[in-house]
């Protein structure tokens, strides 16, 4: 774009959705607005707030990189900002390569915030060797368009340094700077008691392979107000629809599974919007578990938290921010949350926050980016706008046959059926003028010469939750 002194800068942000997007829970889950993990929205919303200034407007680009969109981005935006988490991992290699294809076609600056490499706790990068060329190409493309690249912590910095990259800065994660230079956190009570409100979080692998299931089970037996906070799309589907096509959904040790006692007792939640997530955690006394952004959400709510680290991605971030943490492999499955709470020291986190914040905004300035705390209102207008929105509530277990809950779900199903019917009508209209059976088959797809019915498509979208609820004996 041409640079005019009086024109506001247009910043394109890689994020699943804008913080100001509202809609139904069903639509959010169907579109997967948080890219399989709601923790992604914690840091993308923080980046959106931090980078919004009187001279900069921020726009969400979605998660998927589309190289064919490069020319439009060049014409419409002034800078592309890419907040990332553990992007240097084998399962993310293909999306990373697509992102590189897009970036190589951009003529505007590209700034990466907080990218991380994922490896075992011992910081052994051997498992990343097969994707080294993909990482090299990505980092080189970014550094051709920025002064430096921001990484999560020490391990990722060393990983890139070993490849020969020098313009690498450790900045942590933007989520920790949501509220600027100050970070207030104190233990609001003495030792935890049976009446304490405790939040717990954990991935499927931590629950299945690292003993977190036993820790949760014991905590559930002792603390009546324990609540599990889920983060994955499959967990949201299990909570809202009672089923998911993902194979991990069959793991009954997860509190998000319908057979789990915490599910049946309505002691599980998942949040689409970080502002709702953080807001509901404010009344809790402690948070713990293996999810780094699940615990960061609690810290931002002023709730003492301890992270149970299972790999380098969480460990390096905890070390950088001095977040209380334990290696999950060294935590006995008999540990009581009260022990973690008592041992947690937040002095380093609180006292070192301003220095880390200044380092972060220094990185932004070196890359030509303003921030709301130095150049704006500290996010006041952003927060006020969020406060005025009617955001969807937490996703919670679907138990019972509450008419309101049924109405919302059936209403969404009906709208989806109408959309699919309209889409089918369009396809049939396009096919009506065709006389060649071969042409019809090509248009429809491989292996079949008939259009999928609305009913079949709807079933693929929602599965069988309604029938299972109405006929539980099946």
Stretches found by the model and what they are:
Residues 1-470:
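Active-site anion-handling motifs in enzyme catalytic cores
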């Amino acid at each position: 774009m041409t640079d005019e002194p009086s024109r506001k800068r247009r910043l394109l942000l890689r994020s699943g959705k804008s913080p100001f997007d509202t809609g139904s829970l069903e639509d959010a889950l169907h579109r997967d607005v948080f890219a399989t993990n709601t923790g992604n929205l914690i840091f993308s919303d923080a980046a959106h707030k931090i980078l919004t200034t009187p001279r900069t407007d921020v726009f969400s680009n979605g998660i998927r990189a589309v190289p064919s969109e490069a020319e439009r981005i060049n014409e419409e935006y002034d800078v592309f900002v890419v907040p990332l988490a553990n992007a240097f991992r084998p399962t993310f290699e293909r999306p990373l390569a697509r992102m590189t294809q897009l970036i190589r076609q951009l003529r505007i600056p590209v700034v990466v915030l907080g990218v991380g490499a994922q490896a075992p706790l011992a910081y052994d990068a051997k498992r990343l060797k097969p994707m080294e060329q993909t990482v090299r190409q990505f980092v080189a493309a970014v550094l051709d368009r920025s002064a430096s690249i921001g990484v999560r912590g020490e391990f990722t910095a060393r990983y890139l340094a070993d490849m020969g990259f020098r313009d690498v800065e450790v900045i942590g994660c933007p989520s920790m700077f949501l509220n600027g230079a100050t970070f207030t956190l104190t233990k609001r009570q003495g030792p935890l008691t049976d009446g304490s409100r405790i939040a717990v979080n954990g991935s499927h692998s931590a629950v299945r392979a690292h003993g977190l299931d036993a820790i949760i089970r014991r905590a559930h037996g002792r603390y009546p107000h324990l609540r599990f906070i889920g983060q994955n799309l499959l967990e949201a589907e299990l909570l809202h629809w009672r089923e998911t096509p993902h194979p991990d959904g069959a793991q009954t040790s997860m509190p998000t599974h319908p057979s789990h006692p915490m599910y049946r007792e309505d002691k599980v939640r998942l949040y689409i919007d970080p502002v709702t997530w953080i807001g509901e955690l404010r009344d809790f006394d402690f948070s713990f578990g293996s999810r780094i952004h699940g615990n960061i959400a609690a810290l931002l709510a002023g709730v003492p938290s301890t992270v149970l680290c299972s790999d380098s991605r969480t460990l390096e971030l905890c070390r950088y921010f001095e977040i209380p943490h334990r290696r999950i492999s060294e935590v006995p499955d008999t540990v009581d949350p009260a022990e973690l709470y008592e041992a947690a020291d937040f002095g380093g986190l609180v006292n070192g926050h301003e220095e880390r914040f200044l380092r972060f905004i220094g990185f932004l300035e070196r890359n030509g980016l303003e921030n709301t705390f130095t150049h704006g209102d500290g996010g006041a207008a952003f927060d006020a706008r969020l406060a005025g929105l009617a955001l969807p509530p937490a996703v919670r277990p679907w138990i019972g046959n509450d008419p309101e809950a049924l109405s919302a779900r059936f209403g969404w199903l009906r709208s989806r059926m109408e959309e699919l019917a309209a889409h089918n009508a369009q396809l049939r209209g396009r096919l009506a003028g065709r006389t060649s059976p071969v042409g019809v088959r090509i248009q429809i797809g491989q292996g079949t010469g008939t259009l999928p019915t609305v009913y079949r498509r709807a079933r693929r979208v929602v599965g069988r939750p309604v029938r299972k609820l109405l006929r539980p004996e099946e």
